A protein has these predicted regions:
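Mature, well-folded catalytic/scaffold domains that follow N-terminal targeting or propeptide regions
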Residues: 1-186
């Protein structure tokens, strides 16, 4: 399957940049692995650049294997409407702009609806609004919630939720700047 195709491409002399768009598209599919797939894809390029081509094959094999086995987060209740929102991207578009303040206090479904409604806005404006909302949530974070382990998983919030959001946002910006048609998935 995927590993065989990768090995074939590598044996033909293809390198990471030749695979990067397909890997990015795969990483963004279904909000795979809560965004970790995209983070790993963006960091693979950095590692290969810093450590040299000798690490490319084992790194690509590991990355592709992780993409094949990635969990589809669009199947869990909190993110179930993600696929529908992507399918409808560009259909609504009745807002020309969105800000971080517009997103404050929203749940996942409300945020999906709002970003879908604002799909005509410049993508970097949508990105900045989502990143800004994450930053505002971080500033207003109450440690009380982190210590409430008796609550349902969706109500457990810790510092990892914020730092992961920032790391994922950075990966989205890096990869979607290279491949702009993938911004809606990011």
């Amino acid at each position: 399957g995927a590993i065989s195709l990768l090995r074939g491409g590598l044996s033909e002399g293809l390198r990471f940049p030749d695979f990067e768009k397909a890997l990015t598209r795969c990483a963004l599919a279904h909000y795979n692995d809560f965004g970790h797939s995209l983070i790993y894809t963006s960091k693979a390029a950095v590692l290969i650049d810093r450590l040299g081509e000798s690490v490319a094959t084992p790194l690509l094999l590991s990355l592709v294997r992780s993409l094949v086995y990635a969990t589809r987060e669009d199947l869990i209740p909190q993110f179930r409407r993600y696929g529908e929102a992507l399918d409808r991207w560009g259909e609504r578009g009745n807002r020309d702009s969105v800000s971080a303040d517009d997103l404050m206090g929203m749940g996942v479904n409300q945020a999906l609806d709002l970003t879908g409604d604002a799909c005509r806005a410049p993508v970097i404006e949508l990105y900045d609004a989502l990143l800004g909302a994450n930053a505002q949530n971080m500033l207003a974070y109450d440690l009380y919630y982190q210590n409430q382990t008796h609550r349902p998983v969706q109500d457990n919030v810790g510092w990892l939720d914020f730092s992961h959001g920032l790391t994922f946002a950075n990966a989205v910006r890096l990869q979607c700047t290279k491949f702009p048609e993938l911004w809606p998935q990011g």
